[in-house]
């Protein structure tokens, strides 16, 4: 999988695109002369909680009350209340994916398409099986669709209290753990990949 590391990441999120757009331009102006923009991607919500495969995304996310334990460094360690972020841009092979019958898509995902119920006899190469959080550890995802009608996919946005959880999931998807590759990766291609440390709000306040 590609490594396209940059020095820093700015992630803006909001329901009003014009406000987000103006904030982004303001940030770019503020850092002019100190840093340059290496890459920019705009995303949006699609059918409430689905990605552009048509499946519900984030079904395995912990509940909001449990999310801090999965995503944030514990107190007493360096970077406490911060998180490791894995950011990847996955370009979908939409025509190939949409040509598959729904039951085939469900076996690739390991879940039903309408209500995201995990299949009892899911294939070992299904996406759910290759990224089993009960095996690798819990993470918190905030994935978003991106792109145009002709070129689109998923921005993977994964937060974890332990970078190894994320790296082991990637190794499993690529088939480096057992030799079994994630079937979903035949229909979506990673274009970028980078890790960032996200400090706590309190840590950022102390920088002022």
List where the protein language model places each region.
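Long, histidine/aromatic-enriched segments associated with O2/redox biology
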Residues: 1-208
């Amino acid at each position: 999988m590609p490594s396209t590391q940059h020095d820093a990441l700015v992630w803006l999120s909001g329901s009003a695109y014009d406000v987000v757009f103006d904030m982004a331009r303001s940030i770019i102006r503020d850092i002019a002369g100190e840093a340059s923009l290496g890459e920019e991607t705009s995303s949006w919500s699609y059918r409430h909680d689905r990605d552009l495969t048509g499946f519900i995304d984030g079904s395995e996310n912990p509940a909001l009350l449990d999310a801090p334990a999965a995503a944030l460094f514990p107190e007493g360690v360096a970077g406490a209340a911060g998180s490791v972020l894995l950011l990847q841009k996955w370009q979908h092979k939409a025509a190939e994916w949409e040509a598959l019958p729904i039951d085939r898509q469900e076996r690739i995902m390991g879940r039903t398409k309408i209500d995201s119920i995990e299949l009892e006899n899911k294939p070992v190469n299904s996406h759910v099986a290759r990224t089993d959080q009960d095996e690798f550890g819990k993470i918190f995802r905030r994935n978003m669709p991106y792109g145009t009608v002709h070129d689109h996919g998923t921005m993977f946005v994964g937060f974890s209290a332990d970078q190894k959880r994320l790296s082991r999931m990637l190794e499993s998807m690529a088939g480096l753990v057992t030799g079994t590759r994630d079937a979903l990766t035949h229909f979506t291609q990673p274009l970028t990949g980078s890790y960032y440390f996200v400090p706590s709000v309190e840590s950022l306040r102390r920088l002022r």
